Amino acid sequence: MALLISLPGGTPAMAQVLLLLSSGCLHAGNSERYNRKNGFGVNQPERCSGVQGGSIDIPFSFYFPWKLAKDPQMSIAWKWKDFHGEVIYNSSLPFIHEHFKGRLILNWTQGQTSGVLRILNLKESDQAQYFSRVNLQSTEGMKLWQSIPGTQLNVTQALNTTMRSPFIVTSEFTTAGLEHTSDQRNPSLMNLGAMVTMLLAKVLVIVLVYGWMIFLRWKQRPAH
């Protein structure tokens, strides 16, 4: 579902691990249905959840029936809070909202019809609705359309624990402020690889924590 604007011419330790594994997005069947009658639309997950201090990826994709102009001038923008809310990111300027300075990355390549918005160092105040908007030049003029329901981001507090795991596995995506990946391979494949790597790292944490707990219990057994 999308709105079109057309302009002619233009344990404590284990609990923490499980909480991290719960971060992600829910693609509900009725979240963003294709509207083939109109032939254009934007697809986003219905809900995403993350942990304070962590990061979250909001995937998006879009489709359209028009023939692109020689210079399509394709760009992606994101709004938050409501459909007519403030713009937090615009790839054509580039622009990034003060609230998200140094914390937003758009993994999208010019000409591609899918990508990912990554929010780093999540804050409680980031909890809101997020809407992606597409802008391009077609042979029929400038076309602009946006997701209507958007994606609801829920941010949960990290668990405060006194017990620390002796094993720490970190997965970090380094960036300096705003990054617009205009010279990369297919971002969907790159994001899939990153998600698989992060999942394997989290599974490794669980295995190591369980192993450490079993080792401690074995050490504490009375000698016969």
From Swiss-Prot:
Its job:
Paired receptors consist of highly related activating and inhibitory receptors and are widely involved in the regulation of the immune system. PILRB is thought to act as a cellular signaling activating receptor that associates with ITAM-bearing adapter molecules on the cell surface. Seems to associate with DAP12 and is a receptor for CD99. May be involved in target cell recognition by natural killer cells and in activation of dendritic cells.
Protein topology in the membrane: Single-pass type I membrane protein
The coding gene here is Pilrb
Compartment(s) of residence = Membrane
What's one GO BP annotation on this UniProt entry? Answer: negative regulation of osteoclast differentiation
Transmembrane helix is among the record's keywords? yes
**GO molecular function annotation:** MHC class I protein binding
**Signal sequence residues:** 1-28
The name under which this protein is listed is Paired immunoglobulin-like type 2 receptor beta
Its principal location? membrane
Which species is this record about? Answer: Mus musculus (Mouse)
Database matches in PANTHER family: PAIRED IMMUNOGLOBULIN-LIKE TYPE 2 RECEPTOR, PAIRED IMMUNOGLOBULIN-LIKE TYPE 2 RECEPTOR BETA-RELATED
